[in-house]
């Protein structure tokens, strides 16, 4: 930021960067909140510290000297210590930063945040999400709810990519003095003067000495900056907004085409009496291949720009790298449901979605994050889009930025035109409709096109069954008697279908007189006596069923052995097996038939079984 921008005392964040040269790398990067500092003095302070560090041979001593030189330039008390074991090169390690925050009250003298760094981490990687740098704003005696903002430090920093997470509680406006949004041209987000203190530690093995440029006031000797071009601290760029949730795929769903990149938009920040909510940002770190800039601009992805009282406040944030590729998603929290807030615009409806998918750089799902016990994910429909129900789109994850939206919008396809309820639905059947179908149809005349009285046939079938049962006759007995006298067309199956009216009108018309004549004669015989009825039906009673044959275990074993040798034996072989086992030949033949059928059924089942 140029000196002109740094002249705003109450809204400026001054950062003190201490850089070590030589074979060592950046040791400490302190971020403090202080009054304005002239660009010339800070530049001299940075250069002096860098020169002093380059002359020092011991990395620990140089870091200690740098830690002492930083607070002198700022005119306040702070302490920063670096613990580096001797003989250990600055390989990738875990950075541990501790912070202590003074009460957010106006003070004459600003105090810096004490910072303690252990070892020499190379970069904050995705695997070290636990190593995060947290700046806390806690007003005295206030109970706050944190606002988790996922931050992606992208770019190739020594061949790795870093992540950091800021935790900022949703305090009230009274505890957030100076929280404003700058003009759209500047695009600067200015935190309160005494409310936010944070630090970031980056270590990378570079072949040449590198000086770090602070995000607030960059001072570099290797790469001068034109004075007319101020460095923006927080730059807003619309990013890809895709809620990482499992959405119902419509039948006619089509993938949305990539949209052109829109122009930069100003930050969307909403300050409300009970809390504040602003869009999470993504930090872009420039490639350090010989460059002097460590941290670039902070771009925000507008996800929810206003507190919504009807939403529990759980959503997700997409993490991208410098190339715009999605590397992960994390949940972030806004105001709770109990916080009263004004109703949002009618066109903004956000539904919290869970679970969330964690993607890697290749777009593969590697994990899921369940942020809260919410109902299953549902698609949210914007009220402004019902006029185009023919479109049904699901926005895919794309590396190119697109226009941010409050939620994934799915316009349901138009329902198919339903036929009018009053219009009759004709029965289209490839076969001739049966009597039951014709009789059950409403508004069906009693006579069909052939002059057959369907109602009369239905009544006769019902009475025929009652009279048959009163005589104690079965359908099989009636079928056998009629088959013997009238032919095979009057079998037991024909009697069954006639009683159920599962027969065509013509067939029913043909069966009706024959059945009526036979039933009348059977009733006359029954009046003469049961014996006469049995003689008329076909006389002798049915034989008892043969007792089921039971095989001994030895016989079953022998039959299985024969079956394994030859599943289909000849008649002579069956006779020999029956004599050997002392069983009837017919019993052995039936056993082989049943065994083959069982094997066939088992094979069919195996075909459909899921491996």
Swiss-Prot record:
Per the UniProt entry, what is one GO biological process? Answer: muscle organ development
Q: Which family does it belong to?
A: Belongs to the POU transcription factor family. Class-6 subfamily.
**In which tissues has expression of this protein been reported?**
In the embryo, expressed exclusively in the developing brain, whereas in the adult its expression is restricted to brain, heart, skeletal muscle and lung. In the brain, the highest expression levels are found in specific cell layers of the cortex, the olfactory bulb, the hippocampus and the cerebellum.
Compartments reported by the entry: Nucleus
Write down the PROSITE patterns for this protein, in alphabetical order: HOMEOBOX_2, POU_1, POU_2, POU_3
Record-linked PANTHER family: POU DOMAIN, POU DOMAIN, CLASS 6, TRANSCRIPTION FACTOR 1
Q: Is the keyword Transcription regulation assigned to this protein?
A: yes
Primary localisation category = nucleus
Give a yes or no for keyword Lipid biosynthesis in this entry.
Answer: no
Which protein are we looking at? POU domain, class 6, transcription factor 1
Its transmembrane ranges are none
Role of this protein: Transcription factor that binds preferentially to a variant of the octamer motif (5'-ATGATAAT-3').
Q: InterPro entries of this UniProt entry?
A: HD, Homeodomain-like_sf, Lambda_DNA-bd_dom_sf, POU, POU_dom, POU_domain_TF
Q: Which GO terms describe its cellular component?
A: chromatin; nucleus
UniProt DNA-binding residue ranges: 544-603
Q: Fetch the SMART domains from UniProt.
A: HOX, POU
- List the keywords (alphabetical): DNA-binding, Homeobox, Nucleus, Transcription, Transcription regulation
């Amino acid at each position: 930021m140029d000196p002109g921008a740094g002249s705003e005392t109450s809204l400026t964040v001054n950062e003190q960067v201490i850089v070590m040269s030589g074979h060592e790398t950046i040791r400490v990067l302190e971020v403090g909140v202080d009054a304005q500092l002239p660009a010339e003095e800070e530049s001299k302070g940075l250069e002096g510290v860098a020169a002093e560090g380059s002359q020092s041979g011991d990395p620990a001593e140089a870091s200690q000297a740098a830690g002492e030189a930083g607070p002198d330039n700022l005119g306040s008390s702070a302490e920063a210590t670096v613990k580096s074991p001797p003989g250990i090169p600055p390989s990738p390690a875990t950075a541990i930063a501790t912070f202590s925050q003074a009460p957010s009250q106006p003070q004459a003298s600003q105090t810096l945040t004490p910072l303690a760094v252990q070892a020499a981490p190379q970069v904050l990687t995705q695997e070290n999400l636990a190593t995060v740098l947290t700046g806390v704003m806690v007003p005295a005696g206030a109970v706050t709810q944190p606002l988790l903002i996922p931050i992606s430090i992208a770019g190739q920093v020594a061949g790795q990519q870093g992540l950091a997470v800021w935790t900022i509680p949703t305090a009230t406006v009274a505890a957030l003095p100076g929280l404003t949004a700058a003009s759209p041209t500047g695009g600067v987000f200015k935190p309160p003067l005494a409310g936010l203190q944070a630090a970031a530690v980056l270590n990378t093995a570079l072949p040449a000495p590198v000086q770090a440029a602070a995000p607030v006031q960059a001072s570099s000797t290797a790469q001068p900056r034109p004075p007319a071009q101020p460095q923006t601290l927080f730059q807003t760029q619309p990013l890809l907004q895709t809620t990482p949730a499992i959405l119902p795929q419509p039948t006619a769903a089509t993938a949305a085409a990539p949209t052109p990149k829109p122009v930069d938009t100003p930050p969307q920040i909403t300050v409300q009496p009970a809390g504040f909510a602003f869009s999470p940002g993504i930090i872009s770190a420039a490639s350090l291949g010989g460059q002097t800039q460590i941290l670039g601009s902070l771009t925000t992805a507008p996800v929810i720009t206003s507190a919504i009282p009807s939403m529990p406040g759980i959503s997700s944030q997409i993490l991208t790298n410098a190339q715009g590729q999605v590397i992960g998603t994390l949940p972030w929290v806004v105001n709770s449901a109990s916080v009263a807030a004004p109703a949002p615009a009618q066109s903004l409806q956000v539904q919290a979605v869970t679970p969330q998918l964690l993607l890697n750089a290749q777009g593969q799902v590697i994990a899921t994050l369940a942020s809260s016990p919410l109902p299953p994910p549902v698609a949210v429909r914007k009220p402004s889009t019902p006029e185009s129900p023919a479109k049904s789109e699901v926005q895919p994850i794309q590396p190119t930025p697109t226009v941010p939206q409050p939620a994934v919008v799915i316009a349901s396809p138009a329902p198919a035109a339903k036929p009018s309820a009053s219009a009759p639905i004709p029965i289209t059947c490839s076969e001739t409709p049966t009597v039951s179908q014709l009789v059950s149809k409403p508004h069906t005349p009693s006579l069909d096109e052939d002059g057959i009285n369907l109602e009369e046939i239905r009544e006769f079938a019902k009475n025929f069954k009652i009279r048959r049962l009163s005589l104690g006759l079965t359908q099989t007995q009636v079928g056998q008697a009629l088959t013997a006298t009238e032919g095979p067309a009057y079998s037991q199956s024909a009697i069954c279908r006639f009683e159920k009216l599962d027969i065509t009108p013509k067939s029913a018309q043909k069966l009706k007189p024959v059945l009526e004549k036979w039933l009348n004669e059977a009733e006359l015989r029954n009046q003469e006596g049961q014996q006469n009825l049995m003689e008329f039906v076909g006389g002798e009673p049915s034989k008892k069923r043969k007792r089921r044959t039971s095989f001994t275990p030895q016989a079953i074993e022998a039959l299985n052995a024969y079956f394994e040798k030859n599943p289909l034996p000849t008649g002579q072989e069956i006779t020999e097996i029956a004599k050997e086992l002392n069983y009837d030949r017919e019993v052995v033949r039936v056993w082989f038939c049943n065994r083959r059928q069982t094997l066939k059924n088992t094979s069919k089942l195996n075909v459909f079984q899921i491996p």
